[in-house]
């Protein structure tokens, strides 16, 4: 029985150590599943998907997660700096957060100037 416990500890130790190395953004599935495309996490701008489609020709977005509730978003993503009463835009590549802004114009500018995510 003791040997079984030792074997279990030895087998589980690397797994437990590796989960500590995964960024919070990866655990929350904020990062893009597709290299070369971005995931957007938007707080406080419910109509951004329509704006992006109508106003731009940006096609480097894999997924958009839109949250209208500031309190809920702060609780779910405490590692992000969310400014209340303003739209918040967070851009993730396949590894981590690469850009954040409270300006829609700056978001569009960033996406146009950086068409290929890493």
Residue ranges and their predicted role:
Residues 86-99:
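A short, hydrophobic beta-strand/beta-hairpin element that forms part of a small beta-sheet core
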Residues 97-118:
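C-terminal partner/receptor-binding element of secreted or periplasmic proteins
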Residues 33-34, 82-85:
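Extracellular/periplasmic catalytic domains that process cell-envelope and extracellular macromolecules
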Residues 22-24:
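Bacterial signal peptide processing site
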Residues 17-20:
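C-terminal motif of bacterial Sec signal peptides marking the signal peptidase cleavage site
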Residues 26-61:
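Local sequence-structure signature of Cys/Sec-based thiol-disulfide redox active-site neighborhoods
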Residues 69-78:
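N-terminal post-signal-peptidase region of extra-cytosolic proteins
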Residues 1-7:
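Positively charged n-region of N-terminal signal peptides that target proteins for export
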């Amino acid at each position: 029985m003791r040997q079984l416990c030792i074997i279990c500890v030895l087998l589980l130790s690397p797994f437990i150590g590796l989960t500590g190395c995964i960024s919070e953004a990866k655990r929350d599935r904020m990062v893009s599943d597709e290299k070369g495309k971005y995931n957007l996490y938007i707080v406080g701008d419910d109509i951004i998907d329509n704006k992006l489609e109508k106003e731009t020709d940006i096609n480097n977005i894999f997924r958009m997660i839109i949250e209208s509730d500031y309190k809920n978003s702060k609780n779910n993503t405490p590692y992000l700096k969310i400014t209340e009463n303003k739209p918040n835009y967070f851009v993730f590549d396949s590894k981590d957060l690469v850009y954040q802004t409270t300006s829609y114009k700056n978001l569009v500018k960033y996406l146009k100037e950086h068409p290929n995510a890493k």
